[in-house]
Curated annotation (Swiss-Prot):
<dbReference type="InterPro" id="IPR018371">
    <property type="entry name" value="Chitin-binding_1_CS"/>
</dbReference>
<feature type="signal peptide">
    <location>
        <begin position="1"/>
        <end position="25"/>
    </location>
</feature>
<keyword id="KW-0147">Chitin-binding</keyword>
<feature type="domain" description="Chitin-binding type-1">
    <location>
        <begin position="26"/>
        <end position="68"/>
    </location>
</feature>
<dbReference type="GO" id="GO:0008061">
    <property type="term" value="F:chitin binding"/>
</dbReference>
<keyword id="KW-1015">Disulfide bond</keyword>
<comment type="function">
    <text>Chitin-binding protein that inhibits the growth of the fungal pathogens B.cinerea, F.culmorum, H.sativum and A.consortiale, but not that of R.solani. Induces morphological changes in the fungal pathogens F.culmorum, H.sativum and R.solani, but not in A.consortiale and B.cinerea. Has antibacterial activity against the Gram-positive bacterium B.subtilis, but lacks antibacterial activity against the Gram-negative bacterium E.coli.</text>
</comment>
<keyword id="KW-0044">Antibiotic</keyword>
<feature type="propeptide" description="Removed in mature form">
    <location>
        <begin position="56"/>
        <end position="89"/>
    </location>
</feature>
<dbReference type="GO" id="GO:0050832">
    <property type="term" value="P:defense response to fungus"/>
</dbReference>
<keyword id="KW-0295">Fungicide</keyword>
<dbReference type="GO" id="GO:0050830">
    <property type="term" value="P:defense response to Gram-positive bacterium"/>
</dbReference>
<dbReference type="InterPro" id="IPR036861">
    <property type="entry name" value="Endochitinase-like_sf"/>
</dbReference>
<feature type="disulfide bond">
    <location>
        <begin position="29"/>
        <end position="40"/>
    </location>
</feature>
<keyword id="KW-0929">Antimicrobial</keyword>
<feature type="disulfide bond">
    <location>
        <begin position="39"/>
        <end position="53"/>
    </location>
</feature>
<dbReference type="InterPro" id="IPR001002">
    <property type="entry name" value="Chitin-bd_1"/>
</dbReference>
Length: 89
């Protein structure tokens, strides 16, 4: 028969599993990148949730970020567009 110590241990273990943060990480970022759907925190670890995807983190899609930054730079600096040949006859 199950004694009270066993029941208490089972309850404690179950409660510990429930208290685990659902945004737990999945290891370190590799060259600033994480598996799909995860973000790289400011400290270099992958995960989900505000601790990883907050303002101080980098997003998974670095290529889209770089393209948007380049487009903004070109739009804000017409000299770059001329040097790139934009608007040439």
């Amino acid at each position: 028969m199950v004694n009270m110590k066993s029941v208490a241990l089972i309850v404690i273990v179950m409660m510990a599993f429930m208290m685990v943060d659902p945004s737990m990480g999945a290891g370190e970022c590799v060259q600033g990148r994480c598996p799909s759907g995860m973000c790289c925190s400011q400290f270099g670890y992958c995960g989900r949730g505000p601790k990883y995807c907050g303002r101080a983190s980098t997003t998974v899609d670095h290529q889209a970020d770089a393209a948007a930054a380049a487009a903004t730079k070109t739009a804000n600096n017409p000299t770059d567009a001329k040097l790139a040949g934009a608007g040439s006859p």
